[in-house]
Amino acid sequence: MPYANQPTVRITELTDENVKFIIENTDLAVANSIRRVFIAEVPIIAIDWVQIDANSSVLHDEFIAHRLGLIPLISDDIVDKLQYSRDCTCEEFCPECSVEFTLDVRCNEDQTRHVTSRDLISNSPRVIPVTSRNRDNDPNDYVEQDDILIVKLRKGQELRLRAYAKKGFGKEHAKWNPTAGVAFEYDPDNALRHTVYPKPEEWPKSEYSELDEDESQAPYDPNGKPERFYYNVESCGSLRPETIVLSALSGLKKKLSDLQTQLSHEIQSDVLTIN
């Protein structure tokens, strides 16, 4: 029997950084599955391999490698075309499965030199740190508060390295998580009493509340079930928020389709065995 509900989606807000939308006519298990897929199953590109050629800074090589991996990289235009490195036929790295970055900075002045994401030079103009979006390529012209700090160098210190970014997803490592935050709520007026407030009148109301100003929470509904879910998905900058949502829904749909196919094969095998 096909799933009886017919879910609907309504977008309430869309910006460059986040999307808010409402899903109706579904249940809590499906809603939470969608949330988890946003975080763990949507692929993006992140630095995964680092070779440090010179490092006289105060940070160990491992510290710097970890910081590089967590710098968000713009992945919109290439993530679907890039292969997973485990599926590529190359021996190490190639343009089909990776993007190369280089960094070469030496401090020759008395003033502290901030090495930032702006100093990472990509061999692909489509994959750059999110802070370098729509910026020129002059490494000396940077705005400190806009870029992600990697390390600080004093006079005579240097950092020189080569790194490769690969395709992956959040279930493998947090650096491949495309979201900065994912949240959903399903009972803005607390009619189901899944949350107990010590003083409901002092608790801030949800932006989706339909109560009057003098009401603190809706009457208790003991038979109620959550059917409407209010989502807020914030991107880390690697993908546009709408791309995250569409990719997640596509991935979840494929998982369910694969499960249905496998179950059909299992049922057919059981029928043949019984006969």
From Swiss-Prot:
Matches recorded under SUPFAM superfamilies: Insert subdomain of RNA polymerase alpha subunit (SSF56553), RBP11-like subunits of RNA polymerase (SSF55257)
Residues found modified as Phosphoserine: S124, S257
Entries under SMART domains matching the protein: RPOLD (SM00662)
Entry keywords, A to Z: DNA-directed RNA polymerase, Nucleus, Phosphoprotein, Transcription
Pfam family, one: RNA_pol_A_bac
Single GO term (MF): protein dimerization activity
Signal peptide: none
Binding site for Zn(2+): C88, C90, C94, C97
Region (Disordered): 203-226
Localization in the cell: Nucleus
Listed GO biological process terms: transcription by RNA polymerase II
GO cellular component terms, semicolon-separated: cytosol; nucleoplasm; nucleus; RNA polymerase II, core complex
Keyword Hydrolase carried by entry: no
PANTHER family linked to this entry: DNA-DIRECTED RNA POLYMERASE, DNA-DIRECTED RNA POLYMERASE II SUBUNIT RPB3
HAMAP family listed in its UniProt record: RNApol_arch_Rpo3 (MF_00320)
Assembly description: Component of the RNA polymerase II (Pol II) core complex consisting of 12 subunits: a ten-subunit catalytic core composed of POLR2A/RPB1, POLR2B/RPB2, POLR2C/RPB3, POLR2I/RPB9, POLR2J/RPB11, POLR2E/RPABC1, POLR2F/RPABC2, POLR2H/RPABC3, POLR2K/RPABC4 and POLR2L/RPABC5 and a mobile stalk composed of two subunits POLR2D/RPB4 and POLR2G/RPB7, protruding from the core and functioning primarily in transcription initiation. Part of Pol II(G) complex, in which Pol II core associates with an additional subunit POLR2M; unlike conventional Pol II, Pol II(G) functions as a transcriptional repressor.
Function text: Core component of RNA polymerase II (Pol II), a DNA-dependent RNA polymerase which synthesizes mRNA precursors and many functional non-coding RNAs using the four ribonucleoside triphosphates as substrates.
Family: Belongs to the archaeal Rpo3/eukaryotic RPB3 RNA polymerase subunit family.
Protein name according to UniProt: DNA-directed RNA polymerase II subunit RPB3
Natural source organism: Homo sapiens (Human)
Primary gene name: POLR2C
